[in-house]
Amino acid sequence: MAEVGRTARLALALIFTTAAHAQLLNKDAPVIVGHYHLNVTSIEAHKKFWVDTLGGTAMKFGPGIDVIRFPGVFLFLREQKPTGPTRGTAFDHIGFAVPDVPKLTAKVVANGYGLTVGREPGPGQTASPPTAGNYGRFSYLVGPDGVKVELVTNEEPGAPPIMHHHVHFANKQFVEMQQWYMKAFDATLRAGQTDYFIGADLPGVGYMLNFFSWLPEEAQTGTKGRAVDHIGFEVRGLEAFTHKLEAKGIKLTEPYRKAPELGNIGVAVITDPWGTVIELTEGLRDLR
């Protein structure tokens, strides 16, 4: 069984490696993961992690909103003490792709940040040790306020120093969760499903949505108020898309509107059945 587990992990590592470059922004993709909204205790502490350590770019958006830009994604920072880390919600971590995982991981540790595991053990199981990169291909980091980040290897020639790669969920109902996201965003099942992992690909983008099984006994809570408050999907034809969601039986938490405070982009909000808040936008990709 241990050998099967090692083989599965290696297979996942190879998938991560070969798929990374596909996440460069496809301007024609109907749906992309466009941003994450973080509640942070300190803007400056987060800049030291996201900018000084990982290599993002600090910028301002709209009425003085602090934003960190990476190729493929924005992180919106709101200075408001979070109610908890990403752990404990069905949102597990943000995935980035880099050319040299061990090198950047060493920098992260040298700058005082911690490492963690990919999947947490269940009752009576032995925890995996903190990782400096399984097979040197990927590692899991913990930033300020308990935001979990994964680094995966990008071996494509000319790969940027860092780029957004995927979003990863963890849930006891991980298969049902994957099916909900396929339904909502017209994603497709990805090959390589295991007894603890399943993925979904966004149209025109490919590798993006990953789902782990959640083994700990503790119940999970919603993302609102947590370190990662919500995930943002950028959608072409957003108003019509919201009507399609409603026709699928997916209710809007907040109806479609134009947001003048954000440059008049289109905005709507939905919440998945496990409490993950999802902001839908149209217009953010034009700022890249």
Give each language-model segment a name.
Residues H37-V40, T53-A58, G95-V98, G112, ...:
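Sec/Tat-exported extracytoplasmic proteins
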Residues K27-V67:
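Mature N-terminal segment immediately following signal peptide/propeptide cleavage
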Residues M1-R6:
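N-terminal secretory signal peptides that target proteins for export/translocation
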Residues Q173-Y196:
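Solenoidal tandem-repeat scaffolds enriched in leucines and small polar residues
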Residues A8-A19:
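Bacterial N-terminal signal peptides
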Residues H46-V51, V108, G146, M177-M182, ...:
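Conserved active-site tyrosine of GNAT-family acetyltransferases
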Residues L24-D28, V31-S42, D66-V67, G84-F169, R190-T194, I198-S213, ...:
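Vicinal oxygen chelate
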